[in-house]
């Protein structure tokens, strides 16, 4: 892949905007000297309004208009904000964290280790890729959005954590010794008795769980990349916009 210009652009969401704005907006984007837009990552419920029913009208409007105004496009996989029907049918998809069970309504409230979530995420990614793969204006793909482990502490995540520890410490006595778990009777004598890690007072074990949670993000994004790679062209890239503490760097928040 070769770019002979700096990519400079903006995120655009036709599904949020007054529908008659798209021609005006894309002309303004081009005339402002921008050359790329990012689309699609925030509206799973628009692309799949009910289970198994897909509507990519807004997607094709944006891609066709981008081609008309010679704008490049980065397409995001729409997996960081789940539709309401998914949360209702599979309530276990809503993450369990140190603060308890998530409620539906905000983004990034799902458990990225949940099998039902992963099953439906794969379906929407594949459907999206089928829609965009033949557009020349699509130059790359963003996996998910601002991905983090979201403090996932579900039964699925904790079971994976126990397997991770068993691989790291085949001898359970060594595990207890390394983490100092004899203190306050925290010793684990059988892996099947491993307690809910959210209750631990052992900061070494808590830190190990945080480390493990971050590894879940790597696996999640690698899993998405494998799906996207089945569809993308050789001249298209894959990227991700990792989140960071951006609020303190936003206008109006900087220290004077």
Give names to the regions the model predicted.
Residues 3-8, 33-35, 67-73, 134-139, ...:
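Short, well-ordered coil/turn segments that N-cap beta-strands
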Residues 19-23, 56, 154-155, 251-253:
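Conserved strand-to-helix beginnings and helix N-cap segments that scaffold or border functional pockets
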Residues 1-21:
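Boundary/entry segment of secreted carbohydrate-active catalytic domains
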Residues 23-32, 36-102, 129, 224-232:
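Aromatic-lined substrate-binding rim segments of carbohydrate-active enzymes
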Residues 103-255:
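Polysaccharide-binding and catalytic clefts of secreted carbohydrate-active enzymes
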């Amino acid at each position: 892949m070769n770019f002979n210009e700096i990519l400079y652009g903006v995120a655009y969401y036709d599904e949020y905007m007054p529908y008659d704005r798209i021609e005006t907006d894309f002309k303004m984007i081009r005339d402002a000297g921008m050359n790329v837009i990012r689309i699609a990552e925030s509206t799973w419920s628009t692309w799949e309004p009910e289970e198994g029913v897909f509507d990519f009208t807004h997607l094709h409007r944006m891609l066709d208009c981008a081609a008309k105004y010679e704008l490049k496009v980065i397409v995001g996989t729409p997996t960081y904000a789940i539709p309401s029907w998914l949360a209702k049918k599979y309530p276990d998809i809503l993450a369990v964290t140190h603060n308890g069970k998530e409620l539906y309504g905000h983004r990034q409230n799902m458990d990225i280790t949940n099998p039902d979530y992963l099953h439906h995420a794969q379906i929407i990614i594949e459907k999206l890729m089928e829609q965009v793969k033949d557009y020349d204006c699509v130059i790359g793909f963003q996996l998910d959005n601002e991905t983090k482990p979201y403090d996932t502490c579900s039964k699925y995540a904790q079971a994976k954590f126990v397997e991770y520890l068993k691989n790291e410490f085949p001898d359970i006595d060594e595990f207890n010794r390394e983490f100092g778990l004899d203190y306050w009777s925290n010793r684990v004598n059988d892996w099947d008795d491993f307690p809910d890690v959210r209750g631990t007072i052992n900061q070494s074990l808590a830190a190990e769980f945080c480390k493990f949670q971050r590894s879940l993000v790597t696996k999640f994004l690698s899993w998405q990349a494998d799906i996207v790679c089945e569809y993308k062209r050789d001249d298209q890239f894959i990227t991700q916009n990792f989140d960071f503490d951006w609020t303190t760097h936003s206008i109006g928040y900087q220290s004077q």
